[in-house]
UniProtKB/Swiss-Prot annotation:
GO molecular function: ATP binding; phosphorelay sensor kinase activity
UniProt KW rRNA processing keyword: no
Protein name: Chemotaxis protein CheA
Pfam families to which the protein is assigned, alphabetical: CheW, CheY-binding, H-kinase_dim, HATPase_c, Hpt
Originating species: Klebsiella aerogenes (strain ATCC 13048 / DSM 30053 / CCUG 1429 / JCM 1235 / KCTC 2190 / NBRC 13534 / NCIMB 10102 / NCTC 10006 / CDC 819-56) (Enterobacter aerogenes)
CheW-like domain segment(s): 509-644
Gene: cheA
GO biological process, alphabetically ordered: chemotaxis
Domain (HPt) ranges: 1-105
SMART domains reported in the protein's UniProt record: CheW, H-kinase_dim, HATPase_c, HPT
Domain of life: Bacteria
Cellular localization per UniProt: Cytoplasm
Protein task: Involved in the transmission of sensory signals from the chemoreceptors to the flagellar motors. CheA is autophosphorylated; it can transfer its phosphate group to either CheB or CheY.
EC number from the UniProt entry: 2.7.13.3
Keywords linked to the UniProt accession: ATP-binding, Chemotaxis, Cytoplasm, Kinase, Nucleotide-binding, Phosphoprotein, Transferase, Two-component regulatory system
Amino acid sequence: MSMDISAFYQTFFDEADELLADMEQHLLELDPQAPDIEPLNAIFRAAHSIKGGAATFGFSVLQETTHLLENLLDGARREEMRLSTEIINLFLETKDIMQEQLDAYKTSQQPDAESFDYICQALRQLALEAQQQDAPAAPPVVAQPAPTAVAGGMRVSLTGLKANEIPLMLEELGNLGEVHDPQQTDNSLEVTLLTTASEEDICAVLCFVLEPEQISFTTPPTTAAKPLPSAEVVPPPVAQPQPAVVEPPKAPRAKASESTSIRVAVEKVDQLINLVGELVITQSMLAQRSGNLDPVTHGDLLNSMSQLERNARDLQESVMSIRMMPMEYVFSRYPRLVRDLAGKLNKQVELTLQGSSTELDKSLIERIIDPLTHLVRNSLDHGIEDPQTRLAAGKSEVGNLILSAEHQGGNICIEVIDDGAGLNREKILAKAAAQGLAVSDSMSDEEVGMLIFAPGFSTAEQVTDVSGRGVGMDVVKRNIQEMGGHVEIHSRAGKGTSIRILLPLTLAILDGMSVKVNEEVFILPLNAVMESLQPQAEDLHPMAGGERMLQVRGEYLPLVELYRVFDVAGAKTEATQGIVVILQSAGRRYALLVDQLIGQHQVVVKNLESNYRKVPGISAATILGDGSVALIVDVSALQMLNREKLLSAAAA
């Protein structure tokens, strides 16, 4: 009787992805000259677990690739093979091909045969060369614990099995070693397993089908007696394997920790967040309707409403935290990228990661990867110099690249910092002028720096597969703005460059300021609001094309009229009769004219594009406490829209 295990595919895919990521991280930590045994053991365990899972599900190509890699890793950790940078590079390449094979299986396709043949041949060739290496001292010391494990074995007990799972478990245990003395009932199986695999390795393979609490291990009494004679003959070797005997108890603790978490589909979390958002909106409606009640007559009801508001906010914060992920998910891919690209560019770069535990909403985590990757590649290519140039400038030949993340209020700040050559102001201005961009020598360094985000802008002398095509930096800026954030750049010639990204922690809720234009209510993101004031006539200055500037403490700011941008009839058209809100977007400030301020509060963001269509100048919508809809303004687009309206009016 066979068992359909296709239902467990996704569990294997998720765990294999994590194991491959761990494998890459540990490979990058290895020092070829003096490899640490702990990362080697971790890499070996990851490969062994993937191989076992691949065998279980019949993924033969992935199983064979991992088997060859596992044998080489075993030789390396037994010191039967000397590691080198080239060997680690081959292991990293193998990991990449294993990822491609896994991705193919995810889509029910067969992995690429050509890359499979190539990597198998490369690994077999490496194994052949390793056999020819002269390492006489290593085998007697390291190989001694293995016969003890095989001679004694371990008793493996599996409980809570279905009848059709027992043959499958026997087959899986057979893949891990020699099975002896099997004893089974209708729902349990107990065998003696002669294997060199640890309890953790066995659990990793069987837990693709079973839960950790269904698996237990005992040691037959005979195994304790067998190692004693060797202890009398050669005391040091017997003492040396003791850490291996101590390790197995750690495995159950790790599994117990893992069993306290569950995998939940993102769609289910999104549905929960939407429902909590609706609850918050309903609570706001009730609060608004109860606001006019007499507190003496309805004191109990109003107290209950206050308690409901606190509970709703606490529930919303708790549910939102479910979607938060550490920045380590993003940062973990850059050590490999920096290592490979620096080698390709013949540069020496040390990468420092800071704030990897800082959390960000999952939807933003996934969208920030591409922009951040482009900034890292740009720093390596354009920012950090080659060793000769750095030495000539009095710097260390090793460049420094820092990726950091930290919370700042309701935002997250992500920085890419290098100690390279910095931006060449004259070169950027000349290139921008040649491309027809509006520039002047009086521009600040920050304004000159922001020119690199203009469409098609590039200062590279030649086009390569790394840079020079003039695409990418404008996309970086646009993508960040679409996430409700903005980018800033600071540079010092000869000292380096810092690119700063500010993003909201989540796109599901927003701290906003409500403003009114006639009877229309708009929401301004609170992180863009600097201050508000009532303008005076002497502070307003007309400009060509119908635009006006507002002087605020010596600074001239463009005046954007919200009623004009969205064609709101009946609004106050005279600036001195309204209120001006000073906004900052993409490092630039401007004044926004509205009729009145209502107040600030937290709102639940509703996607306007999926429910209606994309509207220029509007990023989303929300439902207010009275049930009406308010539009959330895209502050980065208002200046351009205001200018377009003025030009259209002048042309008419």
